[in-house]
Amino acid sequence: MQAIKCVVVGDGAVGKTCLLISYTTNAFPGEYIPTVFDNYSANVMVDSKPVNLGLWDTAGQEDYDRLRPLSYPQTDVFLICFSLVSPASYENVRAKWFPEVRHHCPSTPIILVGTKLDLRDDKDTIEKLKEKKLAPITYPQGLALAKEIDSVKYLECSALTQRGLKTVFDEAIRAVLCPQPTRPQKRPCSIL
């Protein structure tokens, strides 16, 4: 069985841990708990192929900037996450996460993931953003950013409702099993 290492990065509180817990346990966790490296392992079938998917959670907070890259070696695919209702987390994909991932892993495939899809149409959330002269991130905006960072795919999901959730991980596996023809075969990430 092929083992795939998938590392999830993004700002603190965008829902990385909820994404992983909801996917692996089919249950949405309660309160927000900042993360320091939790690992999950799941045996899954994608396109009739059994895969052992190793899921590596990371801490988005700046306090962990020096520690986080220790989880990057031998990564097969990255999920760079931002919250669809946090324009700052969207901007940080460009400003922080993409440069960090590419610095350590120049050719590892990336999937861009917009989280908290259930809140994009939530009236209270929209109102709170409007008070700050902000708005939720739209699908075309996500697509444009994915193109800019040369992401394999752009996907949106909700860990709460599980909408689009399975697709995120299926596509992460496909990005490794069936690399895009325009890309040369990727070497796993390594830090020297």
Curated annotation (Swiss-Prot):
Record key words, sorted: Acetylation, Cytoplasm, GTP-binding, Hydrolase, Lipoprotein, Membrane, Methylation, Nucleotide-binding, Prenylation
Cross-referenced InterPro entries: P-loop_NTPase (IPR027417), Small_GTP-bd (IPR005225), Small_GTPase (IPR001806), Small_GTPase_Rho (IPR003578)
GO term, biological process aspect, one: establishment or maintenance of cell polarity
Catalytic class of the enzyme: hydrolase
Keyword Iron: no
SUPFAM superfamilies given in the database record: P-loop containing nucleoside triphosphate hydrolases
Residues bound to GTP: 10-17, 57-61, 115-118
Topology term for the membrane: Lipid-anchor
Lipid attachment residues per UniProt (S-geranylgeranyl cysteine): C189
Modified residues (Cysteine methyl ester): C189
Residues recorded with modification N6-acetyllysine: K147
Activation and inhibition: Regulated by guanine nucleotide exchange factors (GEFs) which promote the exchange of bound GDP for free GTP, GTPase activating proteins (GAPs) which increase the GTP hydrolysis activity, and GDP dissociation inhibitors which inhibit the dissociation of the nucleotide from the GTPase.
EC numbers: 3.6.5.2
PANTHER family recorded: RHO FAMILY GTPASE
Family note: Belongs to the small GTPase superfamily. Rho family.
Protein name stated in the entry: Ras-related C3 botulinum toxin substrate 2
Organism listed in the record: Bos taurus (Bovine)
